[in-house]
Amino acid sequence: MLVFTKKYFTSDGILKDEYILNFHRILGDMPTAGHELRCYYDVLAFISEHQDAEHRRTIVAKHFKDGIDSPIFKSTLNTDLYPYQREGAVFAVRVGRCLIGDDMGLGKTIQALAASELMAKLFSIRKALIVSPTSLKYQWKTEIEKFSSRSAEVVEGYSGQRQKLYKNDSFYQRLPEHSEC
């Protein structure tokens, strides 16, 4: 067990960075001496987050060799994006999730749609859930249908109605703010 521990962990008992992405190797090499091996959910979630992040970095490096001037943007939306919007979309794709905090009127909606469309192309995501103020629910639907080739579903109504809407095939779904749920 000592040899195993020295190979995979620091002297403080922390998993060495180079093994985070190959955690399955650790599980395979771990001597159990006939004992049950238990790995808790939070550990697996932590490892999964790191593996997902590395996968995103690899895909972004492959498809955005020219950075914000990469050709993938030409077929992303039915409009051209400003350089800062492309930058925001690439950032969102690379990190997986983020808040876009630009000033009013600078195209946060377009950046979010571009990021969603890029994630659909690159990672095969099947749905995007948009949470926005109630006053903007149909504005989002209009913008989605204007700038993308997809439909959008506003998820609203009583619980049973919402459950049916969640099962809809629409790529974009707009969720009402908490007070409506």
Regions found by a protein language model. Name each.
Residues 1-62:
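Charged, low-complexity intrinsically disordered regions
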Residues 100:
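Hydrophobic anchor at the beta1->P-loop junction of P-loop NTPases
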Residues 93-94, 117:
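Short, locally clustered residues in the helix-turn-helix/winged-helix DNA-binding domain
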Residues 97:
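Walker A (P-loop) ATP-phosphate-binding motif of ABC ATPase nucleotide-binding domains
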Residues 2, 15, 75, 92-93:
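Residue-level detector of transmembrane insertion/anchoring sites
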Residues 92, 103, 133:
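P-loop (Walker A) phosphate-binding loop of NTP-binding proteins
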Residues 17, 64-81, 87, 106-181:
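SF2 helicase/translocase NTPase motor core
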